[in-house]
């Protein structure tokens, strides 16, 4: 169990780092990160806080649909949101930061290998697909 939790922690940390890299590359963002940036600008809060708020809404929808909630989703929602803000402030703004695209696949692979469930976004997509 300790190994699985370590994989989840490392995957979440690396995923947060990769998201911060992509944001600081100024070349674009992942779709959900782009939404978090837009909501953060609209509310006047950081990307991490807006990401947390979006995850809370997704969690509410999942609970309303009587879908399961995973440890991975909860860790991403809390720790991931904090780490994104930390890494965005620590990393330089540079086009070379697009390296985050390569790191993201490895990060989410680590989270998946931990076997502690899917992220909230994946759970929501699965719930929608089951109902269509």
What are these regions (language model features)?
Residues 1-132:
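Core subunits and conserved enzymes of cellular information-processing
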């Amino acid at each position: 169990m300790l190994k699985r939790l370590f994989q989840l922690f490392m995957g979440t940390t690396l995923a947060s780092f990769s998201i911060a890299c992509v944001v600081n590359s100024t070349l674009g963002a992942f779709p959900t990160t782009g939404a978090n940036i837009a909501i953060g600008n609209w509310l006047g809060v950081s990307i991490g806080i807006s990401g947390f708020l979006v995850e809370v809404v997704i969690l509410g929808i999942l609970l309303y649909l009587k879908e399961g909630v995973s440890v991975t989703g909860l860790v991403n929602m809390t720790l991931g949101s904090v780490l994104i803000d930390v890494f965005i402030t620590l990393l330089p703004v540079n086009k070379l930061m697009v390296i985050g695209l390569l790191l993201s696949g490895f990060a989410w692979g680590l989270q998946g290998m931990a076997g502690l469930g899917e992220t909230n976004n994946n759970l929501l997509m699965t719930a929608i697909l089951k109902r269509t």
